Structures are given as C-alpha cells and as structure tokens.
Regions:
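Oxidoreductase cofactor-interface core, primarily capturing Rossmann-like NAD(P)-dependent enzymes
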Residues: 2-37, 42, 52-64, 73-83, ...
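Residue-level recognition of oxygen-bearing side chains
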Residues: 38, 56, 66, 260, ...
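Acyl-donor (CoA/ACP) binding surface of acyl/acetyltransferases
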Residues: 45
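Cofactor-binding loops of NAD(P)H-dependent oxidoreductases
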Residues: 49
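Periplasmic-binding protein-like
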Residues: 68-70
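A hydrophobic C-terminal alpha-helical subdomain
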Residues: 223-281
Length: 281
C-alpha cells in the first residue's frame, strides 16, 4: 500500500520522508514534487506533481493508497491548488488522504485559516476517508530570528503577551508519519501544538540566558513591525502578513493545551530551549 508525500522536498516534507523511512522501512513511498531530479537525495522514487498543473496530478497519483497532502506554500493559491490535488486523488482512486491543516482552522483568526477551512470542506465533500492534522506554529518561525535578535540587541514582534504553543517541524513530521503508518485515524481531526506555551518575552529571556547577552522583547504596533520587517528586505505583503499573524497570536490564535501532539508521537514535544540552542549554533 504505497504512501505518497506531496511537497516532499520542502522543509516539512523531507522530514516526513525521513520519519517514514525510519518507522516503516518496508513501506513503499513516493515523493510527489515539481522537480523529480531534486528529490534524488530523499532516496525514494519521485514523480512530477505540480499543484498548479492539474495535468501532472492524476498520473502521479496512480497506484497510491494513502496521500499526505502537505499544504501548498503559495498563500492565496492554496484552495485552488488543493482542489486540483483532491480531484485528481478521487479520479486516481486514492483510498485515504492526510492533510496538514492549521491549528483550530475552523475558528482561527489567522489570515491563513480561510484557505485551510475551504480545503477541509473539500475533503469532507470528496468522499475519500481523510485525517486532518491541524498543525500549530513552527517554533522555527520564531527561532529563525534569534541570530538577528542577538545582533540587534532585541527581539521584536507584535504578539504582546500572547501564549504560543509551537512545536518543531520535526515534531509535526513525526506525527504525520505516525498517522500515515497506523490505523484508526480516518475521520479524525488532531489539534497539534507544543506542550510548552511561551510568550515572546519568555523567548527573549531564553535567548538572553543562552547567549549571555541582554536581549529584551520589544513589542511594536502592527504597522511599525510590518514596516521594520519591510526595512529588513521582506516583501511588503509578507511583512504585513507576519505582523498580522503576531497580532493574532496576541489574541490566543497560537495557543492550545490539549497535548494531542505529544500523545500522538508518544513523547514530549521539543522544548523551546532546545530549539533556541540550535538556532544559536
């Protein structure tokens, strides 16, 4: 029963492939990617499958029993692209779809949520057994800024004292691998988040502790934070989106205390301190 992974060369996808190879070495795997040549490093067969080119999808999904649909990286195009994949999966006879959605997608104020809600609705209407992995925030979304914070003397954001229950990509990848290789998940929705909730003030304190430098958290108004990010060279639209996500975090959008992720993977999620250590190198 072959498992296919979309976006298999991406930051999450490659970790899922590694987990699957470790957990179920005899399980047939297929990487679905835009450029099969770039997937050679994964060590599994690869097929061309471009979300935006429906003509590539049905053939790519031939003979696939279980599909991991990793959400598209193209925000604003996700719903259309996901529809292409779901329709192709139905046509190809895929038996099961596992989808990486967003934490509390049905109620989340995050600007990312509507496309995930729409995709979830498509899956429910498709008639294919499915599982929703509602992934919370990646800790790396914040620790990617650690080096810059140390260099600049402050960690900046707009999340206020919002509590963030993030987990690492590796944690979410392991959860996906568990669901893909075990039974009893059809029709289930998992709200996945880290065990440890923290504020950006807490994150700044941890950076200070590990770096030996005083790195305070500086909370900025949304517009000021967006302007600062744009000043660092980010596209204006992306800068505004990131600032908006932080504001949503200040309202609780990134918090969850159900510990469904650690229950699913059978271990605690990766501590914030561990990810900060990795970021400091």
């Amino acid at each position: 029963m072959t498992i296919a992974i979309t976006g298999a060369t991406g930051q999450l996808g490659r970790l899922v492939v590694a987990q699957l190879r470790a957990k179920a070495p005899s399980k047939p795997l297929v990487a679905l990617v835009r450029s099969p040549a770039k997937a050679a490093v994964l060590g599994i067969p690869a097929r061309e499958a471009d979300y935006a080119r429906p003509e590539t999808l049905v053939g790519a999904l031939a003979g696939i029993a279980t599909l991991l649909l990793i959400s598209s990286s193209e925000v604003g195009q996700r719903a259309i692209q996901h529809r292409n994949v779901i329709q192709a999966a139905k046509q190809a006879g895929v038996k099961r779809i596992v989808y990486t959605s967003l934490l509390h997608a049905d109620t989340s104020p995050l600007s990312l949520a509507p496309e995930h809600r729409e995709t979830e609705s498509m899956l429910k209407a498709a008639g294919i057994p499915f599982t929703l992995l509602r992934n919370g925030w990646y800790t790396e979304n914040y620790t990617g800024s650690v080096a810059g914070a140390v260099a600049g003397g402050a960690f900046i954001g707009s999340a206020g004292e919002g509590r963030i229950s993030s987990a690492t990509r590796a944690d979410y990848a392991e959860a996906a691998a568990v669901v893909l290789t075990s039974a009893g998940h059809d029709g289930k929705t998992y709200e996945l988040a880290g065990d440890e909730a923290y504020t950006l003030t807490d994150l700044a304190a941890e950076i200070s502790r590990q770096s030996g430098k005083s790195i305070p958290y500086k909370n900025l108004p949304e517009a000021d934070y967006a302007a600062t990010l744009a000043g660092f060279g980010l596209p204006v639209g992306l800068a505004q989106a990131i600032a908006g996500w932080d504001v949503s975090a200040s309202k609780g959008a990134l918090f969850d205390d159900s510990r469904q992720l650690s229950k699913l993977i059978g271990r605690p999620t990766t501590p914030l301190a561990t990810t900060v250590t990795a970021a400091l190198g």
